[in-house]
């Protein structure tokens, strides 16, 4: 049994096919689902997870720990029919079972990662091109042919998995229907209802701070918060002249926006000669931020926070007194039956899809 060894760097194979490499990515005319199943997940991490993409923009997330399909980023505001996310959740739970069943073919002696990329893109003539590719431990593994209705690949294990999956007639029919009909229909619906999300531009808020570094030096850190799209240029200026871009990164926030930072080591005493310059499609002009004064940044925030807490306390007390005078129960005991679930907020909101 020749199975590729797990190579973390190789798991980017299918990620390279995510929006950004397809022609459709530029105009958001692709809808792709990226599935990942792992045989031996670390404690507290999902064995199965999925992200849904409209062009270069993620709009959906799912994992077996929460077991609910949820809109991602700005797509929580997309107007959808009430059953849409329920259907998406049901379909993804079925897909989760198939992926985890497939991993059992390899046994439990080693770790395996099975990935799938399913979806479609629309060409200039609105003709849909389906995609259904799978990778094992970062190597191309098998494909699904929607016309023949079969999963197949060069590996013996791929054929074994294909036979297992084809024992579920509903799985074959759902895969064919999704790739040939549901996917392009759903894509067009998202393009129509979510046009504002696809054109979403959120300018960054900026901060430049200094902290002690090695003796005789300070470290300047320029941060850009909550911006979209992720493309952003950041550099340091010294007395108005370019002084390098420093070292940093751009990472997702988890709500669809991004966070970026860059650090530069400078001589102690020279900190106030530096500015941070940022260019992004959100603001009309590039942003320049000066070094933040610790005294200025902390006192107002603390004062505002304390004032806000006092205001909320007074308001809550007044509301409770009013309810008691009216003979009404306190708000935290007004929940009944199904409402009990609302007592604990969930990390994400729920709203749009179908698979």
UniProtKB/Swiss-Prot annotation:
Give coiled-coil spans as residue ranges. none
Chain intervals for the UniProt region annotation (Alpha-1): 25-111
Q: Where in the cell is it found?
A: Cell membrane; Endosome membrane
Which segments does the topology annotation call Extracellular? 25-300
Q: Does the keyword Disulfide bond apply?
A: yes
**PROSITE patterns referenced in this protein's UniProt entry, alphabetically:** IG_LIKE (PS50835), IG_MHC (PS00290)
Tissue expression, per UniProt? Expressed in liver and mammary gland of non-lactating animals. Expressed in hepatocytes and in epithelial cells of portal bile ductuli. Not expressed in the brances of portal veins or hepatic arteries. Expressed in the epithelial cells of the acini and ducti in the mammary gland with expression emphasized at the apical side. Not expressed in blood vessels of mammary gland.
Tell me which InterPro entries the record gives.
Answer: Ig-like_dom, Ig-like_dom_sf, Ig-like_fold, Ig/MHC_CS, Ig_C1-set, MHC_class-I_related, MHC_I-like_Ag-recog, MHC_I-like_Ag-recog_sf
Please give the positions of the paired cysteines in each disulfide bond: 222-276
Q: Which residues are listed as membrane-spanning?
A: 301-321
Q: Where is this region: Connecting peptide?
A: 293-298
Where do the Ig-like C1-type domain residues begin and end?
Answer: 203-292
Main subcellular location: membrane
What's a single GO MF annotation on this record?
A: beta-2-microglobulin binding
Give the residue ranges for region: Alpha-3.
202-291
* Membrane topology of the entry: Single-pass type I membrane protein
Pull the Cytoplasmic topological domain ranges from the record.
322-355
Q: Where is this region: Alpha-2?
A: 112-201
Please state the span of the N-terminal signal peptide per the UniProt entry: 1-24
Give the protein's function: Cell surface receptor that transfers passive humoral immunity from the mother to the newborn. Binds to the Fc region of monomeric immunoglobulin gamma and mediates its selective uptake from milk. IgG in the milk is bound at the apical surface of the intestinal epithelium. The resultant FcRn-IgG complexes are transcytosed across the intestinal epithelium and IgG is released from FcRn into blood or tissue fluids. Throughout life, contributes to effective humoral immunity by recycling IgG and extending its half-life in the circulation.
Q: How does it assemble?
A: FcRn complex consists of two subunits: p51, and p14 which is equivalent to beta-2-microglobulin. It forms an MHC class I-like heterodimer. Interacts with albumin/ALB; this interaction regulates ALB homeostasis.
Protein name (database record): IgG receptor FcRn large subunit p51
| Organism of provenance | Camelus dromedarius
